[in-house]
Amino acid sequence: MRKIVINGGKPLKGEVAVSGAKNSVVALIPAIILADDIVTLDGVPAISDVDSLIDIMTLMGASVECDGDSLKIDPRGVKDIPMPYGKINSLRASYYFYSSLLGRFGRAVVGLPGGCDLGPRPIDLHLKAFKAMGATVSYEGEAMRLSTEGKPLKGAHIYMDTVSVGATINTMIAASKAQGRTVIENAAREPEIIDIATLLNNMGAHIRGAGTDMIIIEGVEKLHGTRHQVIPDRIEAGSYIALAAAVGEGIKVTNVLYEHLESFISKLEEMGVRMTIEEDSVFVEKQDKLKAVSIKTSPYPGFATDLQQPITPLLLTAVGRGKIRDTIYEKRVNHVAELARMGAKISVLGGQIIYEGPNELSGAPVKATDLRAGAALVTAGLMAKGQTVITNIEFILRGYSDIIQKLNRLGADIEIVEE
C-alpha cells in the first residue's frame, strides 16, 4: 500500500505550472476513436486516469505513442471488442466510450462507470439521448450494451432535464457522425465542453454553440486526424491557488485561464486574499487575516463543485463562521471528518458543512475518500504542525499531475512511501 507522508509547516514559495485538464482529456481520448487518421493531443496530464485510458485504447487496437505531455493516437486499428470488466470499471469517464463506439461501429458493450463515490450520478440523461438518436440500451450484468441495430444514428432534438456535463459531451460526440441535425437544449456550459467541441470540429465535425445552453450539431460522414492543445485544468489551478493562499509565502500559479475561474477568484477576493492576476498566471501573496465566507456550488459559471473541497483548508484559516452547501453532489462531505481529525472546527449539519476559524491543524493519519477530498487533505497536511499520513492516495493520483514533484519544488516536505 502506498501512502503520502507530509511533514507540515514548511514555507512554500516559487512557481507551479498547471497541467492539461483532466475533465477534458478523459473525453478527448475516447472521442479520437471516431477519427480515420492520427490525432495528437498536447498538454496531456500525467495522471493515472490517462494511463488507464491508454491501456484501454491499446487493448482495443489503437496505436498510442507518448512523448512528454504529447499523446499520438492512431485509432484506425480499433475494434469494437466488449469491455465489461477490467480498467474500464475504475473510470467514471468510461461512459465516453458509449458515444465513440456507437458513432464508429453502431454498437458498444462497456462496463458501468466507476470513479469517486460522490452520491447519485445517474447516466439516465446519456441513455435518453442515445435512445432519441435511435440506439437500443440494455444491461448485461455490470455492463451496458448499446446498439443501433445496424442502422446509423439519427439526429434528434434533445432536452437535458438537468444540466449534465457528461451527458452533454456524450451527446455531442455521438451526434458528430449521426445523420442529420442534433439540438441539445439545457446543455452544460463548462469550458471542457468547448474543448471537446474544438477537437471534434478540428476533426471535421460541425458543432456550434458549445459553451452556451443550446448546442447544434450537423452530422458528418467522416472525421479526420488533427492536432489539439488540451486546455489548462481549472480545478488544478484553483486547488493550487487555494493552497498558495493557505500556506504560501509568495507562489505564482502559471498556465491559468482567469475566465474559467471567475466565480472562484471572486470568492477568494471576498475573503480578502491578496493576489495579482495576469494574462495566464495568478501570483498569490503571503496572507494575513482572512474573512470567513459561505459557499454554494452551482453549474458553470457558478462556483465549481470540484473546488468545494480544495478550498476548505483555506476557509479554516479565516476568522469567523461560514457554511458550504454543495448542490451538485450530496456526498461531497467526506473530507470533513478527516479535517476534524486534524483539529479543525468543522462539521456537517442539515446537509451542509459548517466551519469556524481560524484553526491550527495538527498532523494525523487521514484517508482520501475521493479525488478532491484528497487534494484538501494534502493542503491541510502542508498547513499542519507535525506529520500527516494520507492513505487511499490512488484517488489523488487520478487527477493531479506530478503533484509530489510540483509541491517539492515549492519547498514542501512530501513524499510517497511504499509499504
From Swiss-Prot:
Tell me the domain of life.
Bacteria
One GO CC term on file: cytoplasm
* Catalytic center residues: C116 (proton donor)
Keyword set includes Transferase: yes
Catalytic activities: phosphoenolpyruvate + UDP-N-acetyl-alpha-D-glucosamine = UDP-N-acetyl-3-O-(1-carboxyvinyl)-alpha-D-glucosamine + phosphate
Q: Where in the cell is it found?
A: Cytoplasm
Q: In which pathway does it act?
A: Cell wall biogenesis; peptidoglycan biosynthesis
Q: Which Enzyme Commission number(s) are on file for it?
A: 2.5.1.7
Q: Name one GO molecular function term.
A: UDP-N-acetylglucosamine 1-carboxyvinyltransferase activity
Pfam families for this protein: EPSP_synthase
Q: Which GO terms describe its biological process?
A: cell division; cell wall organization; peptidoglycan biosynthetic process; regulation of cell shape; UDP-N-acetylgalactosamine biosynthetic process
Q: What class of enzyme is it?
A: transferase
Record PTM 2-(S-cysteinyl)pyruvic acid O-phosphothioketal, positions in chain: C116
Matching entries from PANTHER family are given as: UDP-N-ACETYLGLUCOSAMINE 1-CARBOXYVINYLTRANSFERASE (PTHR43783), UDP-N-ACETYLGLUCOSAMINE 1-CARBOXYVINYLTRANSFERASE 2 (PTHR43783:SF2)
This chain's function reads: Cell wall formation. Adds enolpyruvyl to UDP-N-acetylglucosamine.
Write down what this protein is called. Answer: UDP-N-acetylglucosamine 1-carboxyvinyltransferase 2
